[in-house]
Amino acid sequence: MSVETERSSTESSAASGLDFEDTALTLRLPGSSSSSSSSSSSSSSSSPSEPDRKRASATDDDPDNRLGSTATESPPSPKARVVGWPPVRAFRKNALAALAAASSSKAKFVKVAVDGAPYLRKVDLEAYRGYDQLLAALQDKFFSHFTIRKLGNEEMKLVDAVSGNEYVPTYEDKDGDWMLVGDVPWKMFVETCQRLRLMKSSEAVNLAPRSA
């Protein structure tokens, strides 16, 4: 009698479309078995396998890969040009160099020799405005006891007050000729003078001043 009752209940449940597991008395809620099985299958499919995890950890531990990823992700920023004191110092240095070059280009230094003196001196012709200033400078550079004597024909001499010797200021022009100082205009003298010589009057007798 009980066997027939169980068979009839099974047939009725099959006819209604329900399985025996759905109608069985269990501790879980109805329908939880299917959801738990589906979730377990999805988690197993989504979780990586053991070889995949090993490959991923090996890739993370490789320093070359880390450097490559860092280089691709964050390129180095270009260095900004620093503008400050160095350019200012360079500008001042260039300005001073240009000023020094301009001043040196205007200067004209020539050698000065005195008969009987064992040394030479140099004078800047551009620093003077005329023959009087030049002779005064020569007097100060060599012997303080020299005096300047002017003759009637505008010829000038330096006289040694101690020995009484007279010196005639002469110069060598661009052609290599020795001329008397004062025979040409001052600007022409500055342009053509190559060197100066205070020559003794006894040796300068053959030199005659040119007509201006």
From Swiss-Prot:
One GO location term (cellular component): nucleus
Q: In which tissues is it expressed?
A: Highly expressed in flowers. Expressed at low levels in roots and seedlings.
Chief place of localization: nucleus
Instruction: Tell me which domain of life the UniProt entry assigns to the organism this sequence originates from.
Output: Eukaryota
User: How is this protein induced?
Assistant: By auxin.
* Low complexity composition bias: residue spans: 32-49
The listed location of motif EAR-like (transcriptional repression) is 25-29
Keyword tags: Auxin signaling pathway, Nucleus, Repressor, Transcription, Transcription regulation
Region Disordered, annotated ranges: 1-84
Domain PB1 per the UniProt entry, residue ranges: 107-201
Subcellular location, in the record's words? Nucleus
The processes (GO biological process) annotated in the record are: auxin-activated signaling pathway; regulation of DNA-templated transcription; response to auxin
Q: Which family does it belong to?
A: Belongs to the Aux/IAA family.
Question: What does this protein's UniProt record list under function?
Answer: Aux/IAA proteins are short-lived transcriptional factors that function as repressors of early auxin response genes at low auxin concentrations.
Q: How does it assemble?
A: Homodimers and heterodimers.
Which PANTHER family does this one have?
A: AUXIN-RESPONSIVE PROTEIN IAA15 (PTHR31734:SF249), AUXIN-RESPONSIVE PROTEIN IAA17 (PTHR31734)
Write the protein's name.
Auxin-responsive protein IAA15
Whose protein is this, by species?
Oryza sativa subsp. japonica (Rice)
